[in-house]
Amino acid sequence: MKKIKHSFFRIFKNIVTLFPKLGINRKTFGAGRVYDFFYKLFWPYKKAIEIQGSKMLIDSKNTPPEILKTFETYAENLVHEKATTELFKKIVKNGDMVVDLGANIGYFTLLAAKLVGSSGKVFAFEPEPRNYSYLVKNIKLNNYNQASAFQKAVSDKKGKTKLYICDYDTGHHTINKPTGIEAYSRGRAVLEKSIDIETITLDDFFKGKEESIDVTKMDVEGAEALTLAGMDNILRKNKKLKMFIEFFPLLIEKMGSSSEEFINKLLKDYKFSIFVIPEDYNAKIEKLREINTVEEIMNLCKGKEYHINLFLERKWE
């Protein structure tokens, strides 16, 4: 039965790939609801699946397809962003304090919690309510008492803002205000639907503990420059900090910030060494190539249209 469901699911997904060629999308009358119905009907995976040593929970009957799509990626590959995952496992140590910014449903939060063990700490920030609910459930499912989740966005100031909800992928919610439907470089569509969320700064949250953080993971869909501004004290005081950043220049620019200034600040003001994590990177046998100029990074992003994953280590004289 399991193999049959997987077969139907693959056939369904293959058929759906033909829709754009026929001029059909989620906005076509009734297409979105029909797609969601069959997506759930053919959903082949268990309620919980083990990924990278931790269990992730999902309830296909009561879960929006956009969250199921995130889980589908994990279930199919048993890994998310393989190269970054392998490096993350190499960098994070037992007893570390890890901060996960843009935690989604908890992939890197769970991985970090497993790596740091009971003597470590993980702080996960996720503002979107449905993502946050699964983040909390997944932490509890694994009895990771060392991990704590907070339904807040990180920014340059404490307050409230709008979070715009992506209509097909829970990893692309953003505080970028869209005009109508925004089409990003890979065909993303962001609806005008928004919710009010709370924002905090990391400097306020970790006041007095700036030097305790070992690793941060940042995936904040364009709010990187704002997040950086809100953790200035941490960056100036913490000599051991290591960072994983998903860098997408186009989204940073849409927030009114300069992607070039963002990289320059990391290189010159905070004296980080910046390394690009290639998709085919093997953490066990390869060394990362250091990137020394803004121009090199922008070239890899192909004129700001693509994102890349970066690893940063502190460089002190």
Residue ranges and their predicted role:
Residues 1-138, 142-145, 187-191, 206-211, ...:
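S-adenosyl-L-methionine
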Residues 75-97, 144, 160-162, 177-238, ...:
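Short internal loop-to-helix segment that lines adenine-nucleotide cofactor pockets
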Residues 99, 125, 216-218, 245-246:
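Active-site flanking residues adjacent to catalytic metal/cofactor-binding acidic residues
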Residues 112-117, 231-239, 266-269:
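Short, conserved loop/helix-junction motifs that constitute active-site signature segments
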Residues 136-168:
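Core alpha/beta nucleotide-donor-binding catalytic domains of modification enzymes
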Residues 239-247:
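Conserved beta-strand signature within the Rossmann-like core of class I S-adenosyl-L-methionine
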Residues 259-273:
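Conserved Class I S-adenosyl-L-methionine
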